[in-house]
Amino acid sequence: MEFWQNIYSHFNPVAFNLGSIAVHWYGIMYALALLSAIFVAKWFIKHDKLAISNDLFDSYIWWAEIGVILGARLGYVLFYDSHTMYYITHPWQIFNPYINGVYAGISGMSYHGAFFGFIIASYLFCRKNKVSFWFITDIAVLGVSAAYIFGRLGNFFNQELIGRVTDVPWGIYVGGVLRHPSQIYEAILEGLFVFLILAFYRKRKTFDGQLALMYGILYAIARIIAEFFRQPDSQLGFLVGEWLTMGILQSLIILIICVGFYVVRRKIIIKN
C-alpha cells in the first residue's frame, strides 16, 4: 500500500509539453470523457435500435457539449470562485486561458453548473429541431454517466478536490497528510454505479425521461454520500455546521427537482 499512499509523489499533473503549452492529465481525461460519452451513447442507439439518426445526434452532441462547458465554467465562477465579482465585471476573462500573457489554462469547473448547462442546451436543441427532450436525454445520460468516471479521474490526476483526513489504509498522502481518495469514490459512486444501474434498467423503462430523471436522482444521492468524504472547498468551507457543503446543497436541489418531475411524469403516464 505504500506506493498507493504516496502515489502523488510518483507522477506529475502535467502529462507532457507542446512547446510552451503544458498538457495536463486533466485535459486528457476530459477528452476521454467526451469520446466515451459519444461512443457509449451511439453504442446504445445502435444496439437498442433507437429512432434517431446519426446526423441529428451528432448535431445534438455539439449543442450539449457547448452547454456543458458554458454551464460548468459559469457555475464555478458564480458559486465557487473567490473572485466572482471580478468575473461579473470582467466577463470576457471567464474563458481567458492566459494570465499576464502566459498560458495557464482554464481552472475551475462545476459539475452542477455543467448539469444545468446540459439541460438548457438540450431543451434549446430539442425545441429548434422538434425532437422529444425526454427521449434524447434518456440516451445522453447513458453516455454522461460513463464519461463521469474519466472526469473524476482527471480530478485525481490533477491532485484537486481532495478528500478529508483519514486513517484508512487505502488513503493517499496529500501535502504529507493522509486523506480519503474522494475523487476515486466519486468516480465509482457517481459514475460507474450510476451507469450500471441505468444500463441495466433502460429496457425496463416505462416512459421517456425515466432514465434522465433517474440519473439526476441517483447522481444527487451518490454525490451527497461522497461529499462526506470530500474536503469542502477551501474558499467556501461548510455552509452550515460541519456537514452542509455547496455540493450537498446543489445536489439536494437537483434531487428535489428530479423527484418532482419523476412523480409528475409517472402520474401522467398512468393516467393516460
From Swiss-Prot:
It is a multi-pass membrane protein. It is found in: Cell inner membrane. One of its GO terms (biological process) is lipoprotein biosynthetic process. The keyword Cell inner membrane applies. Keywords: Cell inner membrane, Cell membrane, Membrane, Transferase, Transmembrane, Transmembrane helix. InterPro entries: Lgt (IPR001640). Its main location: membrane. The chain crosses the membrane at residues 21-41, 60-80, 101-121, 131-151, 181-201, 209-229, 244-264. Its EC number is 2.5.1.145. It holds the Pfam family LGT. A 1,2-diacyl-sn-glycero-3-phospho-(1'-sn-glycerol) binds at residue 152. The keyword Nucleotidyltransferase does not apply. Catalyzes the transfer of the diacylglyceryl group from phosphatidylglycerol to the sulfhydryl group of the N-terminal cysteine of a prolipoprotein, the first step in the formation of mature lipoproteins. Belongs to the Lgt family. This is Phosphatidylglycerol--prolipoprotein diacylglyceryl transferase. The lineage of its organism: Bacteria, Pseudomonadati, Campylobacterota, Epsilonproteobacteria, Campylobacterales.
